[in-house]
């Protein structure tokens, strides 16, 4: 019998990705502080937040397998967060155009049966096109990507902002690396094809 599988996320994009695996799961939204710690590298931030999300939900769901995930984008050593509004999104896109941004998509699978966890940071390099101010503004008015790191919803129209993507996992850029996740699930003998 499969243990319960829980996605610790409020992200509709992560939910849609997990649905691709056709596994039964539920969603529980973790309430954690997502502020980067002083001196923390972007990959450390993403890994810490993914683990905190999984552990927070696992504490209330004994015996479950809990998936935590977080994504941090970086350029010039600085974290590129969720813009929140049009003006900040436009500023982000101006800064990133013609440049390569690193997206750290961290994943943590917490096994509530054993208290063990597996973590991985899947890095994606996304090179942005050198688009005009008018094109960037039009994109923002059409897509409203104010809730995603880097203002680029690659699962939608945001893919047109990108010139090149390099990643070991094509789902990592959207925020839930499914290749890494299925490897972790196999490691705990969770049946993927049952």
UniProtKB/Swiss-Prot annotation:
InterPro entries: ITPase-like_fam, Maf-like. It catalyses: N(7)-methyl-GTP + H2O = N(7)-methyl-GMP + diphosphate + H(+). GO terms for cellular component: cytoplasm. It comes from the Bacteria. This is 7-methyl-GTP pyrophosphatase. GO terms for molecular function: nucleoside triphosphate diphosphatase activity. Its cofactor is a divalent metal cation. It is found in: Cytoplasm. One of its GO terms (biological process) is nucleotide metabolic process. Belongs to the Maf family. YceF subfamily. The active site is at residue 70. Its main location: cytoplasm.
């Amino acid at each position: 019998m499969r243990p319960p599988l829980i996605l610790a996320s409020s992200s509709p994009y992560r939910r849609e990705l997990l649905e691709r695996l056709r596994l039964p799961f539920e969603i529980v939204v973790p309430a954690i502080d997502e502020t980067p710690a002083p001196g923390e590298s972007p990959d450390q931030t993403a890994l810490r937040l993914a683990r905190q999300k999984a552990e927070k939900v696992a504490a209330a769901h004994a015996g479950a397998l809990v998936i935590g995930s977080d994504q941090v984008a970086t350029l010039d050593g600085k974290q590129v967060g969720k813009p929140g509004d049009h003006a900040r999104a436009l500023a982000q896109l101006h800064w990133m155009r013609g440049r390569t941004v690193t997206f750290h998509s961290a994943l943590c699978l917490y096994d509530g049966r054993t208290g063990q966890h597996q973590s991985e940071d899947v890095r994606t390099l996304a090179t942005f096109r050198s688009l005009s101010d008018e094109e960037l503004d039009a994109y923002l008015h059409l897509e409203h990507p104010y809730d995603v790191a880097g203002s680029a919803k690659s699962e939608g129209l945001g893919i047109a902002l990108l010139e090149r993507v390099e990643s070991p996992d094509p789902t990592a850029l959207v925020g839930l690396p499914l290749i890494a996740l299925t490897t972790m699930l196999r490691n705990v003998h969770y049946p993927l094809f049952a």
